[in-house]
UniProtKB/Swiss-Prot annotation:
The lineage of its organism: Bacteria, Bacillati, Actinomycetota, Actinomycetes, Kitasatosporales. GO terms for biological process: antibiotic biosynthetic process. It comes from the Bacteria. This is dTDP-4-dehydro-6-deoxy-D-allose reductase. Belongs to the NAD(P)-dependent epimerase/dehydratase family. It catalyses: dTDP-6-deoxy-alpha-D-allose + NAD(+) = dTDP-4-dehydro-6-deoxy-alpha-D-allose + NADH + H(+); dTDP-6-deoxy-alpha-D-allose + NADP(+) = dTDP-4-dehydro-6-deoxy-alpha-D-allose + NADPH + H(+). The record marks K164 as: Lowers pKa of active site Tyr. The keyword Metal-binding does not apply. One of its GO terms (molecular function) is oxidoreductase activity.
Amino acid sequence: MTADRWAGRTVLVTGALGFIGSHFVRQLEARGAEVLALYRTERPQLQAELAALDRVRLIRTELRDESDVRGAFKYLAPSIDTVVHCAAMDGNAQFKLERSAEILDSNQRTISHLLNCVRDFGVGEAVVMSSSELYCAPPTAAAHEDDDFRRSMRYTDNGYVLSKTYGEILARLHREQFGTNVFLVRPGNVYGPGDGYDPSRGRVIPSMLAKADAGEEIEIWGDGSQTRSFIHVTDLVRASLRLLETGKYPEMNVAGAEQVSILELARMVMAVLGRPERIRLDPGRPVGAPSRLLDLTRMSEVIDFEPQPLRTGLEETARWFRHHTR
């Protein structure tokens, strides 16, 4: 399937002013799609950048309000070919720990309203950004897509994980009961340009960049041995669109092949910024799963490109960070 698969199609993107959603908007518009960009929180600079694109229409919508979502679909649905669902309440480990109830409530309402509208208004296909965090118990081997709630389901007080699990179960049931053509993407840790630092919920890479660029030490929660796989946001978007183009699998892990410890990551961030190594470990803070290794067999079958190495992506991200935060 070539890039012109998206030319002339109308794609609705939720969370369009968010980190991942904004990259979907840009890539889809560049490939010839008409993009209906739904957002809730104002971000004036990004809004202006996206509004300047030829085929992007920004629409403020409260996805947690069913009447607001239905109103938007009633007006827009006749032209929608595809829905890309990126909107979610998210944050770092501390944010998820402190606001689990809010996250669960917000995310489960959002996905419920969206899938109901995809069904009721006859949208042809949808892709949902899920999470690799739903593999609650880290397996000894790489987690395959089948190693989810269907194989082992247990309670967790992590509202984010619960919300993503609920969303996947609901999507699966919509697929089975209503024939909804819905796909699920489970990313590793996503990073790249556009992921600004928010002290209250910032992800690991922008948090490290902010500290290192300011000449401060990087604080690592735990002993730094916990490992993650990272995926550049543009590679995530490309892989997700390829999944829609091929329709090969209902669920797919998306991540880089490299497994990097958080301590190694901190050293890499310091190096790309040209800063001396200043790192402090804090064993008393929440660290999440000790590892999150993903089976990438499906992804390797679907994509037609090579994801960029972490070091290369970090260098680009650091350049963006310095240009946009000074």
